């Protein structure tokens, strides 16, 4: 019997590791990402879990932008931070109006964009950017998503967006 080898599979550019918590999504995603990078592929590993452990696995600080993993050539990783994504989204909406509208109107806009719905929208936008950004698509052979337990349906939403 021949040993299992990822390099012999015809994998899509996007790989999703989903499921309930505690089943080994992060461990498996990291193992697959490392194996693909070791075989010469350029790989981006993205965690959409606010309680991500990627920084612990690779023993380095990670942010929302891809960071090369020094011990694994060809592998970069990112932690999608929903709070940071919400702040960036909020500012992108409000910035054009600063200095144009009164301060009270800006404060009202900030308040309106401070809820949990804004966080969800912003997190989804940040997630979708990893799929739709052409520079990211061209930079990596594979983009692997290590999802939060409650984000298991995000892949369904992404597939629906791509079908349009």
Specify the residue positions occupied by each region the protein language model found.
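Flexible phosphate-sensing "switch/lid" loops adjacent to ATP/NTP-binding sites
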Residues: 1-10, 15-16, 23, 28-164
């Amino acid at each position: 019997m021949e040993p299992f080898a990822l390099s012999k599979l015809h994998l899509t550019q996007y790989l999703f590791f989903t499921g309930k918590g505690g089943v080994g999504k992060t461990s498996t995603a990291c193992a697959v990402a490392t194996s693909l990078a070791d075989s010469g592929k350029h790989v981006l590993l993205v965690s959409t879990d606010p309680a991500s452990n990627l920084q612990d696995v690779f023993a380095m600080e990670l942010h929302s932008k891809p960071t090369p993993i020094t011990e694994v050539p060809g592998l970069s990783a990112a932690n999608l931070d929903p709070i940071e994504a919400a702040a960036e989204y909020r500012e992108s909406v409000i910035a054009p109006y600063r200095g144009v509208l009164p301060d009270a109107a800006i404060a009202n806009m900030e308040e309106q964009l401070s809820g949990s719905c804004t966080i969800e929208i912003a997190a989804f936008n940040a997630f979708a950017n990893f799929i739709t950004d052409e520079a990211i698509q061209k930079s990596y052979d594979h983009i692997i998503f290590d999802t939060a337990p409650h984000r298991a349906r995000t892949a369904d939403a992404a597939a629906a967006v791509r079908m349009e």
